[in-house]
């Protein structure tokens, strides 16, 4: 491609609304252009990167035995009403009416239309398993779209849906998709981790997220430094301590006056307590109106997902109000504790390992010290109810846990019959009986992974693409292209030779100043730069620069082909 034949729309201005580096660079490099909040035009060079990602996704999905199709982007309300998602989806669902006043929506996801197609065409177990995928534009009316294509209202996604007769078959395909997603991200060239994830409202036994590691990631993931264990913060757990090893204290429980001390931080600062010897007591109310006291170490945080999964608690739970707490404890938040607690106590394992605890006395302006489990509190239950922290022992007892930020670019689920059952997508099984098909679903954020790649690899000058998705592998940057015949001839000849070899190349024939060409090449992220000028040509040389390493060298043109090989 010649630069004059495409649209290079770089700008020096830093958009005010762009916070993330990926958003800033995608706008500055002219890869996207904002049309409305959370809606972007894909400019030619940005689209080229997007298409390279799509090609990798297609290649690996096809290798895995999946077949591509394309579902409508506008969906009739009747389909989503069958699964009750027409109302459940809420304001993120963009609803519209046609001229006949019939209700439609712009597809935020495509479970219902794929099941509708399947129930009309798949009748027997003999047609299964079947894995179908599409690469489709979707729309979710986010209340606050931000971060560019990372959290846009309109986005491009690969979604696949598999159909099965039994759980074993479903699990086999799930594992195949797990492997396929790893292959996709390996081929793109990203540093990532597959992590176990909460199945949420979808249910089922298996769910994995694919997280690209980046400081700008909104998700917190944890992994073991001694094994392949990895999970997101919602699901991550730790090796349970042996409670029998807890030290037995002979110190006497003591009540101390603590006026105006309502937080753990103030307690530790003013009275010089070790925060790891304190506990937090938080009161919740479950869906049936039952109250519980949740107890964690003072430096830990509650995990909402784990709490909602406890057998004792009817989800969803809410935090008890100040009035509710006072009516039960005759004390206010900040003074609550575990001695003579009037509601059922559920304590985290780490809280159970503390001896000589400092906690609220269930009396305003007072705390207890030297509180010990078993002696001072005899009625309690134990559960994992907190977020893991760096240094926790991995649940497989191999290594310790570390935390990092990630950008979720893929998510796979075993749906089972969550959609097929309410939509009557049945088949005749091997036993001759009718039953719902089992399903898996596998989402991959095609446009999001592009932003994730930038977050993971950039410098102060611009984007450093993994070479497999760089818009152009080689940029020819001729100085005085329109003035020097020798420069023009050399540049044109090299351009044709690279095209013949199948190398993705762009020739900057705009006649721009050298500084502009170099800055644009760095900003957009062309992988290899070849600078052609009269001075070096007189010696039979050109300047070569590797965008990733910033290494420059003066080489003969024939050596360039060795570098690119």
Swiss-Prot record:
Transmembrane feature ranges: none
Which family, according to UniProt? Belongs to the class-II aminoacyl-tRNA synthetase family. ProS type 1 subfamily.
SUPFAM superfamilies the UniProt entry points to: Class II aaRS ABD-related, Class II aaRS and biotin synthetases, YbaK/ProRS associated domain
Give the protein's biological function: Catalyzes the attachment of proline to tRNA(Pro) in a two-step reaction: proline is first activated by ATP to form Pro-AMP and then transferred to the acceptor end of tRNA(Pro). As ProRS can inadvertently accommodate and process non-cognate amino acids such as alanine and cysteine, to avoid such errors it has two additional distinct editing activities against alanine. One activity is designated as 'pretransfer' editing and involves the tRNA(Pro)-independent hydrolysis of activated Ala-AMP.
- State any single GO MF term: ATP binding
What UniProt notes about the protein's domains is:
Consists of three domains: the N-terminal catalytic domain, the editing domain and the C-terminal anticodon-binding domain.
Note the superkingdom of the native organism: Bacteria
Quote the Pfam families the UniProt record gives.
Answer: HGTP_anticodon, tRNA-synt_2b, tRNA_edit
Q: Does the keyword Cytoplasm apply?
A: yes
InterPro entries cross-referenced by the UniProt entry: aa-tRNA-synt_IIb (IPR002314), aa-tRNA-synth_II (IPR006195), aa-tRNA-synth_II/BPL/LPL (IPR045864), Anticodon-bd (IPR004154), Anticodon-bd_dom_sf (IPR036621), Pro-tRNA-ligase_IIa (IPR002316), Pro-tRNA-synth_IIa_bac-type (IPR004500), Pro-tRNA-Synthase_IIa_type1 (IPR023717)
Q: Which GO terms describe its biological process?
A: prolyl-tRNA aminoacylation
Look up the record and report any one GO term of the cellular component aspect: cytosol
Principal location listed in the UniProt entry: cytoplasm
Catalysed reaction(s) here are: tRNA(Pro) + L-proline + ATP = L-prolyl-tRNA(Pro) + AMP + diphosphate
UniProt name for this protein: Proline--tRNA ligase
**EC code:** 6.1.1.15
UniProt keywords, alphabetically: Aminoacyl-tRNA synthetase, ATP-binding, Cytoplasm, Ligase, Nucleotide-binding, Protein biosynthesis
Q: How does it assemble?
A: Homodimer.
Q: Which organism is it from?
A: Francisella philomiragia subsp. philomiragia (strain ATCC 25017 / CCUG 19701 / FSC 153 / O#319-036)
Where does this polypeptide localize?
Cytoplasm
């Amino acid at each position: 491609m010649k630069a004059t034949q495409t649209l290079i729309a770089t700008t020096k201005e830093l958009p005010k609304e762009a916070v993330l580096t990926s958003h800033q660079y995608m706008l500055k490099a002219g890869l996207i252009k904002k049309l409305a909040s959370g809606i972007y035009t894909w400019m030619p060079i940005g689209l080229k990167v997007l298409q390279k990602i799509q090609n990798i996704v297609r290649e690996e999905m096809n290798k895995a035995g999946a077949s591509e199709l394309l579902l409508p982007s506008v969906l009739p309300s009747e389909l989503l009403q069958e699964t009750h998602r027409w109302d459940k989806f809420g304001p993120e669902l963009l609803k519209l009416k046609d001229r006949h006043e019939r209700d439609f929506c712009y597809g935020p996801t495509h479970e219902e239309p794929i099941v509708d197609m399947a129930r009309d065409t798949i009748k027997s177990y003999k047609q299964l398993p079947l894995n179908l995928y599409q690469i489709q534009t979707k729309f979710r009316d986010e209340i606050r779209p931000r971060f560019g294509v990372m959290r846009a209202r309109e986005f491009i996604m690969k979604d696949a849906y598999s159909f099965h007769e039994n759980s074993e078959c479903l699990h086999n395909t799930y594992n195949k998709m797990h492997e396929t997603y790893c292959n996709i991200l390996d081929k793109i060239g990203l540093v990532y981790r597959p992590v176990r994830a909460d199945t949420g409202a979808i249910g089922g036994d298996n769910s994995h997220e694919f997280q690209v590691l980046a400081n700008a990631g909104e998700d917190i993931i944890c992994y073991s430094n001694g094994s392949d264990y990895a999970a997101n913060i919602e699901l991550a757990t730790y090796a349970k301590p042996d409670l029998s090893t807890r030290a037995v204290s002979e110190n006497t429980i003591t009540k101390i006056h603590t006026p105006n001390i309502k937080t753990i931080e103030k307690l530790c600062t003013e009275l010089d307590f070790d925060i790891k010897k304190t506990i937090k007591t938080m009161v919740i109310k479950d869906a049936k109106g039952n109250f519980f006291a949740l107890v964690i170490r003072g430096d830990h945080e509650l995990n909402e997902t784990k709490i909602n999964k406890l057998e004792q608690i009817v989800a969803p739970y809410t935090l008890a109000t100040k009035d509710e707490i006072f009516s039960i404890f005759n004390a206010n938040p900040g003074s609550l504790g575990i001695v003579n607690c009037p509601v059922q106590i559920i304590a985290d394992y780490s809280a159970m390992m503390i001896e000589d605890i400092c906690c609220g006395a269930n009396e305003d302006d007072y705390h207890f010290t030297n509180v010990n489990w078993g002696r001072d509190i005899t009625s309690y239950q134990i559960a994992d109810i907190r977020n893991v922290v760096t240094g926790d022992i991995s649940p497989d007892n191999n290594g310790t846990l570390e935390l990092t930020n990630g950008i979720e670019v893929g998510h796979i689920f075993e749906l089972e019959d969550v959609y097929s059952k309410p939509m009557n997508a049945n088949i005749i099984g091997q036993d001759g009986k009718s039953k719902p098909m089992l399903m898996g679903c596998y989402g991959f954020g095609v446009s999001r992974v592009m932003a994730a790649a930038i977050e993971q690899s950039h410098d102060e000058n611009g984007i450093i693409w993994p070479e497999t998705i760089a818009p152009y592998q080689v940029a020819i940057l001729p100085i005085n292209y329109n003035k020097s015949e020798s420069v023009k001839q050399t540049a044109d000849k090299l351009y044709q030779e690279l095209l013949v070899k199948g190398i993705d190349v762009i020739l900057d024939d705009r006649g721009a100043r050298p500084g502009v060409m170099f800055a644009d090449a760095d900003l957009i992220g062309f992988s290899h730069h070849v600078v052609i000028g009269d001075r070096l040509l007189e010696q039979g040389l050109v300047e070569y620069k590797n965008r990733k390493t910033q290494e420059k060298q003066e080489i003969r043109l024939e050596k360039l082909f060795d570098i690119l090989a």
